Each structure stands twice: as C-alpha cells, then as structure tokens.
C-alpha cells in the first residue's frame, strides 16, 4: 500500500512538474473545442434525420459548440461507419442504427468496420415505432384477422419493404416468425417506391416507421392494424399493439443512438452522454419527436452497450431464418 501510494504521489508530482495535470484537466473541461460533426449514414429525410436534428439542436446549446448533421449515405450505412471508425479529430460522431449495429454484421460477409471494437456507445437517443399496415381494400381490421387470412391462404398475401435487410423487412420477418405465417416479401429500393405501391393497392401490407406514414393513416389511405411498441401510441390510441393481440413480449421499433470512434477519450464520451441525456428531455426535442411519434430515450453509454448486445442476439436468428442477404 505504502509503495503504491508513494508511486502515485511521485507520478502526480512528475506530471505536475511537467505541467501536464493542468493541461489534462483543461483538455477534459474544454471539450468540445470546436464544432462537432454528427454523421448520419443515410440520405436526408426519414426517421434518422428527424432524430439526429432534434438532438443536435439541443446538444449545440448544451455543449456551447455547434453540433451539425452531415448525411453520408451508401452501402447500407457501411460507408459512413467505416469513415467515422477512422476519424481521429475527437469531434466526429455518428448515428448508430439497428441496421449498422445489429443487422449488417450478420448479412454481410465482411464489413469495413468492427461495430464492437471501432466505436464507443454514447447514448441511445430515440426509438421510432414500427407500424404494421395494410391497404384499406384488404378485408382485415386488425392483426388477428390479418394473420388468420395469411394462414388461410398461405403465400397469397405479400408485403413490401425498402430493401433486403431494411427495418421494414426485419419487422415483417420477425412478425412472421412470431406468428408462424408465410407472407411473400417484395423488396424495393427505398421507402418511397414501396409506399407508392402500397397506397395503390399493388401491395397488401408493409411495416414502416411511423413518421413516414402517419399522414396516410390519418386520411384513411392506409390502415394500421398494429404497432410494434410495448404500449399504445398517443397518436394512435385506438390501434392495439402486437402484444395486445395475442403475442406477448413482442416489440419492434427502429432505434437510433450516438456512437463515438474508439479513439475518443472516455471523458469526452461521458460528457457527451450526459448532454445527450439532458437533450432528449428538453421540451423542444420532445415536441419535435412527438410530432413524428418518436420516443425519446437518452440513456448512458453502459445502457446503450447492453442494448446493442441484446439487439444483436435478437436479430441474428431472425436473419438466419429468413436467409436475409444484402441487395
């Protein structure tokens, strides 16, 4: 004990003599010392940008430096993830997603990044409810009736998604596994073309994030037969959850969190995480997210790391069962 104490004292004195202790303290206290680049690995628009911009606005105020969103789409998010994994400026972070963290590792033979080693989880920012939808002409009013119809006519019903491995693809395959039904998958290149065909009645069903379809539900152009949330949404109080309709424990949400490169000092990560927690509780952020039925979270780095691990375990068997491969 005496030896350890003496060593620590000598070490501290050496640092102090060299002028390093004050510099280290100042470096931790002054982060961020410039604008923070918040990379979104998808094209502008959609749930990812809604979450990123809602949090960035509040983070800019809390941190005293601009936090700006930079969209870098491509390769199912792999391009941006690889770039940020190599970033060493201490002021670049990225929006982590169910796809880049819990799906891509199991559908791509090789990734240009390691989701576990190349990043430090900062905070789970928000969850975006997945809604299960049908065209109004389909003779079903709820999920139970939809599943009954699918079982009665196996292979006759179809559903669309924004592409292989997309959140909508996963949501429907997860539902198929939970309900032991077969529904034909029709992949599209993006949510837009998928919604066009669903609205036109060329598709029977789909699962889509709430922000993209709330307007169509409200106007009766699409029918929501279930939500993937654990509780009913305030925006859709008459629509029961999947769990309520006979599949207890079922939950399907798209989720978004902040990641930092593994090279970022832990002190900066912790400061950023604390700011994220505050940002996601701010009235302005809550109001922004509520308009699109998104649910604010704002957890700690440890909580986000545990959540990612749980999601990876959940989606690996779903991906294997459905034999999902990238487009």
Description of each model-found segment:
Residues 1-7, 11-22, 26:
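N-terminal secretory signal peptides
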Residues 8, 76, 142, 187-190, ...:
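Short loop/turn segments at beta->alpha junctions
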Residues 27-117, 156, 164, 181-204, ...:
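N-terminal (or domain-start) structured segment
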Residues 33-35, 218, 244, 266-327:
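An extracytoplasmic/periplasmic, membrane-proximal ligand-sensing/linker region
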Residues 86-91, 106-193, 242, 255-288:
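Hinge/capping helix and adjacent helix->loop/strand transition within the periplasmic-binding protein
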Residues 95-100, 104, 161, 191, ...:
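Beta->alpha turn/N-cap motifs
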Residues 127, 213-281, 310-313:
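C-terminal lobe and pocket-closing loops
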């Amino acid at each position: 004990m005496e030896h350890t104490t003496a060593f620590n004292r000598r070490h501290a004195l050496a640092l102090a003599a060299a002028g390093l202790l004050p510099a280290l303290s100042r470096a931790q206290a002054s982060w961020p010392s410039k604008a923070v680049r918040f990379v979104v690995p998808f094209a502008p628009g959609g749930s990812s940008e809604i979450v990123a911009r809602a949090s960035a606005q509040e983070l800019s105020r809390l941190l005293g430096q601009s936090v700006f969103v930079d969209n870098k789409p491509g390769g199912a998010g792999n391009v941006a993830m690889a770039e940020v994994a190599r970033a060493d400026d201490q002021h670049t972070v990225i929006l982590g997603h169910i796809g880049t963290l819990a799906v891509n590792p199991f559908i791509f033979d090789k990734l240009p990044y390691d989701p576990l080693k190349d990043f430090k989880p900062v905070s789970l920012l928000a969850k975006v409810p997945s809604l299960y939808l049908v065209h109004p002409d389909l003779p079903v009013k709820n999920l139970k009736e939809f599943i009954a119809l699918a079982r009665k006519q196996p292979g006759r019903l179809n559903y669309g998604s924004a592409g292989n491995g997309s959140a909508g693809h996963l949501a429907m395959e997860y539902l198929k596994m939970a309900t032991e039904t077969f529904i034909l998958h029709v992949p599209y290149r993006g949510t837009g073309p998928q919604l066009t065909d669903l609205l036109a009645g060329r598709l029977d069903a789909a699962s889509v994030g709430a922000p993209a379809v709330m307007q169509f539900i409200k106007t009766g152009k699409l029918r929501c037969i279930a939500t993937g949330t654990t509780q009913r949404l305030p925006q859709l109080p008459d629509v029961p959850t999947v769990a309520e309709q006979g599949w207890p424990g079922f939950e399907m949400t798209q989720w978004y969190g902040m990641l930092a490169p593994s090279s970022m000092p832990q002190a900066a990560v912790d400061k950023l995480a604390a700011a994220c927690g505050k940002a996601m509780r701010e009235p302005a952020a809550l109001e922004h997210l509520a308009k699109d039925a998104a649910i604010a979270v704002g957890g700690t780095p440890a909580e986000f790391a545990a959540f990612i691990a749980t999601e990876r375990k959940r989606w690996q068997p779903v991906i294997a069962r459905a034999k999902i491969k990238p487009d």
